[in-house]
Amino acid sequence: MSFDRLAPHYRWLERLLAGEVLQQARVAHLAALDQAENILLVGEGPGRFLQALRARQPAVPITVIDASTKMLEVARAVGSGPTTFIQADLIRDPLPTSEWDAIVTHCFLDCFAPLSLTQVIEKLARGATPRATWLITDFGLPPSGWRRQRARLAHALMYRTFRIATRLEAKQWADPSANLIENGFQLATRRAFSHGLIQADHWQRG
């Protein structure tokens, strides 16, 4: 899986396909990080959330991990303050030793098939403090009706496209909720966007 080819074009592609909806979802729970002292962003992509976070918290230490070297270059160009950028694949590579009291995985967990998803969440959870916050923006699947059918069609199109463009591992969306609960996190708040196609979650441990 590699987003290197998409990195230079990701921002305008996102705006073309989703407008500002994804960014609105990313920052929906930004205030939940106001007390964080050591923040980990995984799969940050081109750095739009990093910019918003830095505008609110210019001095907090932030670590950005991405498997894509090109995405890290784009994010680094907009990053400021005490920010560490690390190129790593969380399936193959060890997680840097630290204790994060906030983890952010926007548009990241939905890239993984169920087995890999379990491994990634367990690895990240081991690096989190006992009272850590975890923010997640990903696909969602409404419970019923036309919204659910619309989401299924959108998922199928997006996964097919990204599997071709990036060799994405996942073939369909896998709900991470059970894995998060198993690792001590509970859902604090969820906001739905685009009729439930996208959901922004605030999970809390402890």
Region spans (language model):
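Core SAM-dependent methyltransferase catalytic element
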Residues: 183-185, 191-206
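A short glycine-rich, Lys/Arg-flanked "PGG" loop and its adjoining helix->strand segment in the class I
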Residues: 118-130
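Class I SAM-dependent methyltransferase Rossmann-like catalytic core
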Residues: 1-21
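A short acidic, Gly/Pro-enriched loop at the edge of an enzyme's catalytic core
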Residues: 95-103
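A short SAM/SAH-binding and catalytic strip from SAM-dependent methyltransferases
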Residues: 102-116
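Class I SAM-dependent methyltransferase SAM/SAH-binding core
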Residues: 40-41, 45-92
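C-terminal alpha-helical "lid/dimerization" subdomain adjacent to the S-adenosyl-L-methionine
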Residues: 137-183, 190
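Conserved alpha-helix/loop element of class I SAM-dependent methyltransferases that forms part
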Residues: 19-36
